[in-house]
């Protein structure tokens, strides 16, 4: 009797489910990279609005950088999800998490050091308030996107490990069956037939 554990129908169905989970990935992950692309376009429009209506070059420059960052994150998450590339998703997670930390520190450090904007002029206070608001919004969004790419990467890794485990057990099973067939052929003393003798 074979000592190799047979692959059950439930396991086959599970692997089929994991295979099919790759098919509709754009339905489950499209929301994330579409949001990144939409935010990059929205931030770009807001940047030009700041330049045209408020003539504020500081906020305009920061928003242009933020728009470019969201475009890069969009490309990383899009290609990482479409081609099931854990390396790109890992890069997306690290990039988004690092930039989120920078955004939050740029807001929290001035507060912890007790810098006050009440002594500033109205124009400077307006710029600082917008700067703080943008950093808080960007930090929150980047944290969310980092969590999404991390979850997607874990999902791909689990599918890959399931495939490897399934293939290993399948190879063990087929090798054991081949050994059993060879033993039975020897026990019955089966001989190869010469097909040319029938011509």
UniProtKB/Swiss-Prot annotation:
Keyword check for Transmembrane helix: yes
Chief subcellular location: membrane
Signal sequence region: none
Record key words, sorted: Membrane, Transmembrane, Transmembrane helix
Transmembrane segments: 35-55, 57-77, 94-114, 131-151
Entry GO terms, CC: membrane
Keyword Transcription assigned: no
Compartments in which it is found: Membrane
Membrane topology summary: Multi-pass membrane protein
Name of the protein described by the UniProt record: Uncharacterized protein F46C5.7
Record organism: Caenorhabditis elegans
